[in-house]
A protein has these predicted regions:
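Domain-exit/linker segments immediately C-terminal to small folded modules
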Residues: 14-17, 89-183
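Bulky hydrophobic/aromatic packing residues
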Residues: 31, 75, 203-206
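Histidine-centered nuclease catalytic patch
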Residues: 48-80, 89-108
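DNA major-groove recognition helix of helix-turn-helix/homeodomain DNA-binding modules
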Residues: 85
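C-terminal, charged low-complexity interaction regions
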Residues: 139-236
Length: 236
């Protein structure tokens, strides 16, 4: 989970028009325009687990609406989520951090320790402050990545496997960058690192924290993180 800017997209106004009409008529908010706009805003990935390879995505209410029309049809309360995380979250974690207004990855550290087997572990740790929203978000992240039922645990293993492969690829780019023999080769790999550290990348929070946790070794690579998300801006 990282901060995602809720930017205007080609379908944003169409989505908001659909939501207004749906609110007036009592119809569903689940329209094609709303789905398209949310997919674009959230870069096609689940806002909770950051997986981009899920087979099913849904519209989720950050604040459960419980029949409240304003919350039900509020564009700013609608988020793009995979079916796995949506089913786990439901209305059980309240409040959680709003990733469109709060710098989640600067409030929570995202770490993967160990390797294959029992030593591998995902950790979500408050960076400085610790409040109810942060604690609830950490509970949600743990349940999303590890599952809460036998079926959800199986789904979570697939997400962790996807995360492992993605991080392994990222680490390989880092190694190639550090071992590059000339500037041309380094520039080519730099383009890959920039792509992997963008908001649109899968599992971005883990990749950024890999750099922040290893400043002596990887400090040079922070220049590839978008300017508005650099560590120094948040004093962590």
């Amino acid at each position: 989970m990282i901060k995602i800017e809720r930017k205007e997209t080609p379908h944003t106004q169409e989505a908001m028009d659909d939501l207004q009409e749906a609110c007036n008529t009592g119809r569903s908010y689940n329209t094609e325009h709303v789905n398209q706009a949310l997919q674009e805003v959230f870069h096609g990935k689940c806002y909770i687990c950051e997986n981009k390879e899920a087979t099913s995505y849904q519209i989720e209410h950050l604040i459960p609406h419980r029949g409240d029309k304003k919350l039900k049809y509020d564009w700013n309360n609608l988020f793009w989520v995979c079916a796995h995380c949506n089913n786990i979250k439901s209305d059980k974690y309240e409040p959680i951090l709003n990733c469109t207004t709060e710098p989640v990855e600067h409030l929570i550290a995202f770490r993967k320790t160990g390797y294959f087997g029992t030593d591998e572990k995902l950790e979500f740790v408050p960076v400085k402050d610790d409040n109810v929203a942060i604690r609830n978000t950490i509970l949600l992240l743990n349940d999303a990545y590890y599952g809460t039922t036998p079926q959800k645990k199986m789904e979570a293993r697939i997400i962790r496997r996807t995360l492992r492969k993605d991080l392994s690829k990222f680490k390989e780019y880092v190694r190639e960058y550090q071992e590059a023999e000339n500037e041309e080769e380094k520039e080519d790999i730099a383009m890959l690192l920039k792509r992997e550290l963008k908001d649109s990348s899968a599992f971005t929070a883990f990749k950024r924290w890999l750099i922040w946790d290893n400043e002596e070794k990887y400090g040079e690579l922070e220049k590839f993180i978008p300017e508005n998300q650099k560590k120094k801006l948040f004093d962590i």
